[in-house]
Structure formats: structure tokens, C-alpha cells
């Protein structure tokens, strides 16, 4: 999140390649410290151009991203009365993006003035905010992928889950993200180094390296493995449904919804993986053999990529929810009129599924449209 001439984008890193002061690797925003020790003269033309360019780019991203996420939150709040999980999760994602983008003015102000103006509290809040929002986003995306998977292979379980259950899960993502960000919030502190103020963690470099490695696992590796497995199994379910000779019509979820969720996940990885590799390279291999100017450019690019993710996401959220609403409306319409082969229509507002064991489940149409009656995935079930 912060800017630095060293190989660090948002985390505190050991000062290298011309930095005037030693710094521990640290938290999101940490490169704000390094920006106070630019490898170019503070008033040089190169420094002014770099400062102006990055300030304009980040400010533009902030304005576009904040407007988009506020719009998304406004629209999604209108649908909170429904039982659809998608709306709860999109609100979670937009809120995380908005909180992350709100840090841009602090970064730009610090980089332009070469001074830290926000005290010890500012250090603790801004340096831990990245970890919090990063994890809240990827945990929510993992929940969304799990929900879509369950809608295909366990549709009746999905029907029976209430809106309150999904809100608890959404809240749980924030609590878990806060737990992971808490060590940085407690360890970071404002330190005077000569005439400058720096935000530095109180622990040593080994501890910090272990902490960053843990966060890389919880924000990239772990969720990546889970989401990858879910989509492999979803692809297998689709493949089996296409090859099946079963004559009863099966209602599969809108592939566009699944593709858009996967697209949001891939965008997250594309924007954050370079940043993480840049950080971990500095932790485990030391300063890369780059000139100060080159390291500064890489730092700018990785920083802009992470903010670019939150800037572009609202457009994907809009497409996602539009396709999801269209799918729900088509599902409700088809069930209320003719109904698919082998499925008997019921009065508007209810569907009834009979299990092979003789048990039955009745649910509201709002919840029913959330699920997929995939006979191949749920042996022994038949919608009547």
C-alpha cells in the first residue's frame, strides 16, 4: 500500500539500495517509511515527476474505486431482504475494497510531503488495514466459491440455509481477518529517526519474516488450493451432467455466474501475487540486484496493481449481480409457467422436492432459485 524506493510495496523492508535509514520489514503501508528516504534528490526533476505521476494515478484509482464500491453497496443493500447469499457476499467484498481504497489519501499525502502526519494511531490503523481487507476479500471469495459448489452438489442443503447463517459467515471472515492482522496492529509503533518519524514493528526480522510467510499462506496459498479444488470438482460435475444419458432435465447454475466469480478470484491473484513475490524475495533473498530507480519502478507497479484490484472489482460485481438476478428471474419464471421435463410446477412461491427415502422439503421460491436440482449430484432426489 505504501510507496518505497526499496523492494517493498506496502510492507516495511530492510533498507537497501541507497536508503538512508535501516528499516525492518513490516506491515501494509510500510513502504511509506521508505518513501521518506528517496534515492533521488527530494527536489530533483525526476523526484517531482515520479511523485506527481504516482500521486495522480493513485488518486484517480481512489476516486473511481470509491465511487464504484459505494454504488455497489448502495445497490446491494436493496437486496438484503432476500435470502440470496450472493448479495451478502458482494457487500462484504465491496466493503473490503472501499476500506482499502480509503487509505490512498494518507499514502499520497505522506509521499508528496515526505513526512508522516498521522501519529502512532495512524501507524497501527493504516499498517494493519491492508492485511485486514486483503484477507476479508479472499475469505469471502472462498465462501462464494464454496456456496456455488454446494448449490450444484448439495442443493437441498443450500436451500435450508438461512440469510442469518450467511451473515454469520460473512462476519466470521472479518473476525478471522482481524485476528491475522492483530499482531501487526499491536507490534507497529511510531519511531523517531533523526528528523523523520517512521512506523516500525517492535519484533525482529526473523519474526517478521515468519509473520509475512504465514500471511502469504493464509491470503494466497491456502485459499488458492481450496478454490482450485472446488472449481475442479465443479468442472467435473458439469462434464458428467453433459455426458449423462439421464432423460430428466437437470437445472444447472448459470455458467456466467461461476465464470465471473472465478474471474474475480483470478484478478485478485494477478494483482496481489506480484506484490507478495516482491515482498518475499526481499525477505528470503535479500535486495534484488536492481538499481534504485528500477527497484522504485517495480515498487510503484506492485503498489498500483494492488489498488487497481479494488478499482476494477466494482465493475465485475455489477456484472456478477446482474447475471445472478437474471438467472434467478429466469428460474422463477420457468418454474412458475411450464416447468422443466419431469418437474411439476407448484403455486407461485413454493417448490417441493421429494427424496428417495420419502422425506420432502418445501421452501420459498426465493431460496429455491438459489439452488440447483442436479439429479446426478444428489442421488435419489426428484423434484415433483
Swiss-Prot record:
Residues 1-54, 114-124, 187-209, 286-299 are extracellular. Gene3D superfamilies: Rhodopsin 7-helix transmembrane proteins. InterPro entries: GPCR_Rhodpsn (IPR000276), GPCR_Rhodpsn_7TM (IPR017452), Urot_II_rcpt (IPR000670). One of its GO terms (biological process) is neuropeptide signaling pathway. Expressed in neural tissue, including sensory epithelia. Residues 78-87, 147-167, 233-259, 321-384 are cytoplasmic. GO terms for molecular function: urotensin II receptor activity. CDD domains: 7tmA_UII-R (cd14999). It is found in: Cell membrane. The keyword Transit peptide does not apply. Keywords: Cell membrane, Disulfide bond, G-protein coupled receptor, Glycoprotein, Membrane, Receptor, Transducer, Transmembrane, Transmembrane helix. Disulfide bonds join 123-199. It is a multi-pass membrane protein. GO terms for cellular component: plasma membrane. The chain crosses the membrane at residues 55-77, 88-113, 125-146, 168-186, 210-232, 260-285, 300-320. Glycans are attached at residues 29, 33. Its main location: membrane. Belongs to the G-protein coupled receptor 1 family. High affinity receptor for urotensin-2 and urotensin-2B. The activity of this receptor is mediated by a G-protein that activate a phosphatidylinositol-calcium second messenger system. This is Urotensin-2 receptor. It comes from Bos taurus. The lineage of its organism: Eukaryota, Metazoa, Chordata, Craniata, Vertebrata. The gene is UTS2R.
Amino acid at each position: 500500500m505504501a510507496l518505497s524506493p526499496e523492494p517493498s510495496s506496502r510492507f516495511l523492508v530492510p533498507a537497501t539500495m541507497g536508503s538512508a535509514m535501516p528499516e525492518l520489514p513490516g506491515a501494509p503501508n510500510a513502504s511509506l517509511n521508505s518513501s521518506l528516504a528517496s534515492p533521488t534528490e527530494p527536489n530533483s526533476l525526476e523526484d517531482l515527476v515520479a511523485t506527481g505521476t504516482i500521486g495522480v494515478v493513485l488518486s484517480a484509482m481512489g476516486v473511481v474505486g470509491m465511487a464504484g464500491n459505494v454504488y455497489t453497496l448502495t445497490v446491494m443493500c436493496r437486496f438484503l431482504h432476500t435470502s440470496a447469499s450472493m448479495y451478502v457476499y458482494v457487500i462484504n467484498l465491496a466493503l473490503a475494497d472501499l476500506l482499502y481504497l480509503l487509505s490512498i489519501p494518507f499514502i499520497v499525502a505522506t509521499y508528496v510531503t515526505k513526512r508522516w502526519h498521522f501519529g502512532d494511531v495512524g501507524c497501527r490503523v493504516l499498517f494493519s488495514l491492508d492485511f485486514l481487507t486483503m484477507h476479508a476479500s479472499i475469505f469471502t471469495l472462498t465462501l462464494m466459491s464454496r456456496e456455488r459448489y454446494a448449490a450444484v452438489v448439495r442443493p437441498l442443503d443450500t436451500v435450508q440455509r438461512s440469510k442469518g447463517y450467511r451473515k454469520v459467515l460473512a462476519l466470521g471472515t472479518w473476525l478471522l481477518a482481524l485476528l491475522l492482522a492483530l499482531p501487526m496492529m499491536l507490534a507497529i509503533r511510531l519511531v523517531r529517526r533523526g528528523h523523520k518519524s517512521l512506523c516500525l514493528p517492535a519484533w525482529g526480522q526473523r519474526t517478521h519474516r515468519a509473520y509475512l510467510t504465514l500471511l502469504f499462506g493464509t491470503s494466497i496459498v491456502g485459499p488458492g488450493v481450496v478454490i482450485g479444488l472446488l472449481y475442479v470438482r465443479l468442472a467435473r460435475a458439469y462434464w458428467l451432467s453433459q455426458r449423462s444419458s439421464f432423460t430428466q432435465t437437470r437445472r444447472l447454475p448459470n455458467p456466467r455466474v461461476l465464470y465471473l466469480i472465478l474471474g474475480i478470484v483470478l484478478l485478485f491473484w494477478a494483482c496481489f501475487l506480484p506484490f507478495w513475490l516482491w515482498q518475499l524475495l526481499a525477505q528470503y533473498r535479500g535486495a534484488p540486484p536492481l538499481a534504485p530507480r528500477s527497484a522504485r519502478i517495480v515498487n510503484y507497479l506492485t503498489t498500483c496493481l494492488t489498488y487497481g484490484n479494488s478499482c476494477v472489482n466494482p465493475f465485475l460485481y455489477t456484472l456478477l449481480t446482474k447475471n445472478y438476478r437474471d438467472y434467478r428471474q429466469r428460474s422463477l419464471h420457468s418454474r412458475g409457467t411450464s416447468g422443466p421435463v419431469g418437474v411439476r410446477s407448484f403455486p407461485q412461491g413454493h417448490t417441493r422436492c421429494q427424496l428417495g427415502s420419502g422425506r420432502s422439503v418445501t421452501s420459498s421460491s426465493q431460496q429455491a432459485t438459489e439452488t440447483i436440482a442436479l439429479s446426478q449430484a444428489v442421488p435419489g432426489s426428484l423434484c415433483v
